[in-house]
């Protein structure tokens, strides 16, 4: 819809368009020129123009270089990041006749099982209730009706099976949530401290917590921002930080709302592998 609306405006008015995009495929029929910026190196905050020309020429001549540098190159296959062992484990999270929504039910009578070691994709158009259902599964939004239940083996001592009734510290290390808007979960003034919150809250020592934080920052290509304020990062960097923060707490169940949005090819691949 966005593509078609933009195309109509260009055809009608002859306006010049500059589009900033990781996934250029959808715009190729409208694009006359492609400019590719390189990733800044460790000693510099600035990148440089590494390719500039007609789309066919740029991708034909520099496709391998661009792919190696992390760009999404049209026609390139996405790597298979599935684990070698796809055996389904025990049921760790389930729903019983779940109705979810914010006042008005967006879904009713839902019965689902989620297994250890299994990755489930929740899909649907805008407004279908994906984010609302994700918050409900993570124990952060009360169901309208029915239940979200966690396995007996994962529930806190002296607590029931419904995560919505748990305290925040009881959710930690059991169910993690990566929000659609990363800023909603930031609680520190520095990136490194943000990632260390989970391990610290779980009782890990200072050294261990920051070792975990350093490892996660490296895996997410965020090490050079360790002393930066989370709110100064780009949209894609904020999203990687929110994922790193949740992974640092090693939850048994991880619910992520559009975690790879705004990522280039290399950061997308690294996040999916994790």
Residue ranges, per PLM feature:
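H-loop/switch region of ABC-family ATPase nucleotide-binding domains
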Residues: 21-22
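Conserved beta-strand-loop-alpha-helix hinge in the C-terminal portion
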Residues: 40-70
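The feature captures the beta-strand-to-loop junction immediately N-terminal to the Walker
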Residues: 123-125
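Helix-to-loop junction immediately C-terminal to a conserved catalytic motif
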Residues: 138
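Conserved ABC ATPase "signature" region
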Residues: 207-225
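Conserved ABC ATPase signature
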Residues: 229-233, 237
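Catalytic Walker B motif of ABC-type/P-loop ATPase nucleotide-binding domains
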Residues: 254-257
């Amino acid at each position: 819809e966005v593509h078609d609306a933009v195309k109509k405006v260009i055809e009608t008015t002859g306006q010049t368009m500059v589009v900033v995009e990781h996934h250029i495929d959808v715009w190729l029929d409208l694009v006359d020129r492609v400019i590719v910026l390189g990733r800044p190196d460790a000693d510099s905050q600035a990148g440089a123009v590494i390719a500039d020309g007609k789309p066919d020429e740029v991708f034909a001549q520099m496709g391998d270089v661009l792919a190696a540098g992390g760009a999404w190159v049209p026609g390139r296959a996405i790597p298979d990041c599935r684990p070698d062992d796809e055996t389904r484990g025990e049921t760790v999270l389930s729903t019983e006749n779940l109705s979810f929504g914010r006042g008005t039910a967006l879904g009713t009578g839902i019965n689902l099982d989620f297994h250890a070691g299994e990755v489930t994709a929740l899909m649907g158009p805008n407004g279908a209730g994906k984010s609302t259902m994700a918050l409900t599964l993570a124990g952060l939004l009360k169901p309208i009706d029915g239940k979200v239940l966690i396995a007996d083996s994962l529930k806190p001592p002296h607590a029931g099976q419904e995560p919505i009734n748990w305290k925040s510290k009881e959710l930690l290390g059991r169910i993690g949530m990566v929000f659609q808007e990363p800023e909603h979960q930031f609680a520190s003034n520095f990136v490194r401290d943000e990632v260390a919150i989970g391990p610290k809250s779980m009782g890990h020592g200072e050294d261990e917590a920051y070792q975990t934080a350093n490892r996660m920052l490296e895996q997410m290509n965020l090490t050079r921002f360790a002393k930066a304020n989370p709110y100064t990062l780009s949209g894609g960097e904020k999203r990687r930080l929110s994922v790193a923060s949740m992974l640092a707490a090693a939850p048994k169940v991880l619910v992520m709302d559009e975690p790879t949005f705004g990522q280039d090819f290399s950061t997308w691949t690294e996040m999916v592998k994790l």
